[in-house]
């Protein structure tokens, strides 16, 4: 007995819709071809089984019919189809089986499956690394990647120039053929046109009838000002070209921002370490601070500033996408104590030390902290 759909999803037959959905998403993520190792055919097979199982069990009517007739009944239909000897490529779609079941026994009308030889191209992802200044100002970047592009010889239709594309006479352009199996009417992909519904007598030599071919591409992409690390930018229609004139997929550019030597980013705010002399910390003053847009601004240091204090420069942080508002820059004060003193400097500090020791100052003052370090 082959594994039924409940076993494939790892749930009981009484599982709720929410439990089915949770199990499906977990398994689909695990066995998705993008996450599987290259050449892992077992993962691809498992992924198809998971999708087929969930497609039936998520639908209440299909699930009821499946529970009634069972998985083996479905498998037996396949066995009888190949019982005449030789090989068979018969792989009926469970949707077709249940679709015809409800059509024949519940008075519904079976709709013809819409088919087309046109297939949308795949989406592409490109990882782009920029620096913080580029993220602040915005920039245009020329990126290079390879993808399927529309054939410029046949203009995407897959046929040699001047040749016509005809409707498949085996399936009348539907892309599927029907066979009767007892009370089931089963559809299978047309063997003549491979489900395209059309026949190309003389395929284009450049693209071998696919309407596209592989090529190295260059594209100028615009990175807006204020872009954040991890931002994904969509470029509609810049993915892989579709098959036989199908719509192109999209290109997704994922942004990574390099770490900066001076600034650390926190949303739209910037943080930086600002070294100042102990004289400026004690007496106050002004120091020049570099800003992200280039140049410097003056920052006022209040008298008595302590090591580790934080001073804010408003609207000197990062720009925000699609906004005129900017973040702030927060400077973290680091008081530097001189290591090499001149004779005169030492004399002045010794004099200051004597005067300080004769006074009763608050233990948390800057100068008492300095005395405790020097004692």
UniProtKB/Swiss-Prot annotation:
Keywords for this protein: Chaperone, Cytoplasm, DNA replication, Metal-binding, Repeat, Stress response, Zinc, Zinc-finger
Residue ranges of domain J in the record: 4-70
Chief site of localization: cytoplasm
Classification via CDD domains: DnaJ (cd06257), DnaJ_C (cd10747)
Identification of the protein by name: Chaperone protein DnaJ
GO molecular function: ATP binding; heat shock protein binding; unfolded protein binding; zinc ion binding
Cofactor-binding details, from the entry: Binds 2 Zn(2+) ions per monomer.
Role, per record: Participates actively in the response to hyperosmotic and heat shock by preventing the aggregation of stress-denatured proteins and by disaggregating proteins, also in an autonomous, DnaK-independent fashion. Unfolded proteins bind initially to DnaJ; upon interaction with the DnaJ-bound protein, DnaK hydrolyzes its bound ATP, resulting in the formation of a stable complex. GrpE releases ADP from DnaK; ATP binding to DnaK triggers the release of the substrate protein, thus completing the reaction cycle.
Subunit structure, as described in the record: Homodimer.
Binding site for Zn(2+) 2: 168, 171, 190, 193
PROSITE patterns, A to Z: DNAJ_1, DNAJ_2, ZF_CR
Compartments where found: Cytoplasm
Species in which this protein is naturally found: Rickettsia canadensis (strain McKiel)
A single BP term in Gene Ontology: response to heat
InterPro entries: DnaJ, DnaJ_C, DnaJ_domain, DnaJ_domain_CS, HSP40/DnaJ_pept-bd, HSP_DnaJ_Cys-rich_dom, HSP_DnaJ_Cys-rich_dom_sf, J_dom_sf
Residue numbers binding Zn(2+) 1: 151, 154, 204, 207
Record lineage: Bacteria, Pseudomonadati, Pseudomonadota, Alphaproteobacteria, Rickettsiales
Annotated zinc fingers (CR-type), start-end: 138-216
Pfam assignment, any one: DnaJ
CXXCXGXG motif repeat ranges, renumbered to this chain: 151-158, 168-175, 190-197, 204-211
Domain comment in the entry: The J domain is necessary and sufficient to stimulate DnaK ATPase activity. Zinc center 1 plays an important role in the autonomous, DnaK-independent chaperone activity of DnaJ. Zinc center 2 is essential for interaction with DnaK and for DnaJ activity.
Family: Belongs to the DnaJ family.
